[in-house]
Amino acid sequence: MRDGLNQSPLNPLPAAVWLLALPVIAAEVVFALGRAGFVGGAEGVGLRLSAMQITAFAPEMIQRMWSLGVIDWDQLYRLVTYSFVNGSLTHALFVLAFTLALGNLVGREFRPWAVIVLYLGSAAGGALVYTAAMSLLPGRPAPLIGGYPAVYGLVGAFTFLLWARLAATHANRLRAFTLIGMLLLFQLVFGVIFGNAGYGWIAEIAGFAIGFGLSFLLVDGGVARALRHIRQR
């Protein structure tokens, strides 16, 4: 009984999850200090905008490379850096909440390097799919900024784990997609109410699909081992 009392009521987060969350936290701290006048001097108020300009992903970048047949290696970092700078504090808080919660769950089944590859791969893949889609849609595409495509990759990995668990118990595997359905419904309602839906959801859905697909390759031991591990629980 005493041993149980000595245990922490909170499960420690995997180091890989902190590695993904800390850049977002650090950025928001710097932005807050800038608004308060402690960092950046007179330009401190605009630190978030400056960071967004440096890290945002613009589809035109890939479209230009494709048309010219060259790769601008100096700009490819934007495929992943856009996911660590968010448009507002509220945006960052939502991203952090999902990253910590879902990252903790996914990190129990994936190795640390796999969690990082999953997160960054979903961000980069979501950006590329967004670029391809926007080349077919009218209007000038808005730049991507914020961690939602990467977070949706974690949703995809979590969905994979639920899907594998339901498959092991011969239950309806479609139930595993309840979370993504709820998120999409919430996003639709939010976009209709505030009128700022845009096309960013394309990158987010792509991030989900990529996260789900990568899980078959990245989960420790593959699908067979994941099913055996779940049965033992």
Task: Give, region by region, the residue ranges found by the protein language model.
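A detector for small-residue-rich transmembrane helices and their helix-helix packing motifs
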Residues: 1-233
